[in-house]
Design a protein with these regions (language model features):
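A short acidic Gly-Thr/Ser loop motif
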Residues: 30, 124-126, 237
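Short, structural beta-strand-to-alpha-helix junction motif
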Residues: 32-35
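FAD-binding core/adjacent interface of flavoenzyme oxidoreductases
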Residues: 50-60, 65, 71-73, 79-121, ...
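Beta1-alpha1 glycine-rich phosphate/pyrophosphate-binding loop at the start
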Residues: 118-180, 241-246
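Conserved beta-strand segments of alpha/beta enzyme cores
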Residues: 43, 142, 183-185
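Ubiquitin-like/PB1-type beta-grasp interaction modules and other compact soluble beta-rich domains
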Residues: 1-20, 26-29, 40-70
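General beta-strand structural signal in soluble alpha/beta enzymes
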Residues: 27, 46-47, 145-147, 187-188, ...
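Short, flexible coil/linker segments at domain boundaries that flank nucleotide/cofactor-interacting
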Residues: 13, 113-115, 138
Length: 250
């Protein structure tokens, strides 16, 4: 296994076992499927649709353009990015030859929705999003903060210091402060996927996917939040895009 000792937000005291393309590998809580595969020396995870060229992991989260996989267990789901799948014990997945396959068995999981009204909705819990949410909360506003990653922080999770102090301490202290306000709703693993007229935003929260087979049956797997906000701050950051040229995938 290829890993750097002392780096990464992993629980190295626990080992998770998963299967990819029929082979068994191990990882740790805090891994994504992509990071666990890379640590195990697996670089090609899929193939292109037309020419069958190998596709690997090109980015660390949803900006990855090519690491598409098919999850078979705990429930079949196609066309997911390996970089966004949190590793769970017993996960079974395989690389995609361009197209996925829908589940052939009934989905027995629960799904629900919730309606929320707020003065300020902040999309993205990186440095700008955390500060925007904290500033509004200190003014007494009703705030909703959503972020699609497992933990808040964004680029701060890979930054040593901010404003003369530890970046991780800043994130932790800000999250604790936001949690102390009764009118602040902070949702991680929640993707805002639609922004419509009059401050209406739809967001999908993944509530139990990261728990794998340990997910409680009395909790919905996913929840759609229908949010009506007086103001919306989009603090999702930016990502570099690879240059397009002939054979740039070789």
């Amino acid at each position: 296994v290829s890993r750097l000792d002392g780096y990464g937000r992993l629980d190295r005291s626990r080992t998770l076992t998963f299967t990819f393309d029929g082979a068994t590998f191990t990882g740790h809580p805090g891994d994504t499927l992509a990071s666990a595969l890379l640590a195990s020396g697996v670089h090609a995870v899929a193939t292109s649709v037309t020419l069958g060229r190998p596709r690997g992991i090109a980015a660390a989260w949803s900006e990855d353009p090519s690491g598409l996989v098919q999850v078979e267990e705990p429930f079949p789901e196609p066309m997911l990015l390996a970089s966004t799948i949190e590793l769970t014990d017993g996960l079974v997945a395989r690389g995609l030859p361009g197209r996925g396959r829908l589940a052939e068995v009934p989905d027995t999981a629960r799904y629900d929705r919730r309606y929320t009204h707020c003065g300020l909705l902040v999309v993205g819990a990186g440095p700008a999003g955390l500060l925007a949410a904290r500033t509004a909360a200190r003014r007494g506003e009703r705030v909703v903060l959503v972020d699609d990653r497992p933990a808040a922080g964004g680029t701060l999770l890979g930054t040593e210091r901010i404003a003369g102090r530890s970046a991780l301490d800043f994130v932790a202290d800000t999250v604790v402060e936001l949690r102390s306000y009764p009118d602040v709703l902070h949702l991680q693993r929640t993707t805002a996927f639609g922004h419509y007229d009059d401050g209406f935003v739809l967001a999908l929260q993944r509530r139990t996917d990261h728990l794998g087979t340990d997910a409680p049956r009395n909790v919905s797997r996913q929840r759609v939040h229908r949010i009506r906000a007086a103001q919306v701050v989009v603090a999702t950051g930016a990502h570099e895009r690879p240059i397009v040229f002939e054979d740039n995938d070789r």
